[in-house]
Amino acid sequence: MKQLTTYLPLLFLLLLGACKNAKTGSAAQLSDDALMDTVQRRTFNYFWEGAEPNSGLAPERIHMDGIYPEKDQNVITSGGSGFGIMAILSGIDRNYITREEGLARMEKIVSFLEKADRFHGAYPHWWYGDTGKVKPFGQKDNGGDLVETAFLIQGLLAVHQYYVNGSPQEQALAKRIDTLWRDVDWNFYRQGNQNVLYWHWSPEYGWAMDFPVHGYNECLIMYLLAAASPTHGVPASVYHEGWAQN
């Protein structure tokens, strides 16, 4: 039931298709397992086959005709890549690719992230995948994006747990991921030790975006990771006052 609820929008579309074909009696019957496999495989394919070549990370957009009027075919997204990383783990576990192929891709990703632009440990929303330099998301949004960083870090931590007790090569990768996780300075993004986390910081414009993040919305993971950080953990008051607004 939990799986079915998770993929309810897709199921709704499938049911619409079934209703449309009801007159011909050709409606396809999908079991819960078959539905799950279809969603996982197609999600995996997007992030595996569509990855930006140099970084292994997720492009901000893919134009199926190969035409990019804005010349942005190499622009990659940090938060979307966090979800893509977890999709690749699913692909390994479901034998869509070998464990060795998955590890090679993860090593490419981590090698890129170790060298790519970061801002007090936090990643920007976009990079140029061929250089690792920040691609501004907006005029004053050319630095750290703490929400997108959280989406990326949660994916990396899933990889860490997948490999931490594996082969020596896998354990070495898990250790490198742990360093990236520990480098994120969540406390810095409190802007002067306020009891709230700020979404953006720019080395050029500072706190000009001025976006304190309050609940409740999709940004909860940012507060959870900030509280859990072994190196830059925030006090409970940041969660209670900033997120829950108690």
Where are each of the predicted segments found?
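Aromatic- and histidine-enriched alpha-helix N-cap/loop-to-helix transition segments
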Residues: 39, 75-86, 144-154, 212-217
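Well-ordered alpha-helical scaffold segments within catalytic/enzyme domains
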Residues: 27-35, 45-46, 82-97, 112, ...
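Bacterial N-terminal signal peptides that target proteins for export
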Residues: 1-8
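C-terminal motif of bacterial Sec signal peptides marking the signal peptidase cleavage site
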Residues: 15-18
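Extended ligand-binding clefts on enzyme/binding-domain cores
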Residues: 33-35, 121-149, 165-246
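Membrane helical hairpin/interfacial module
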Residues: 73-82, 86-142
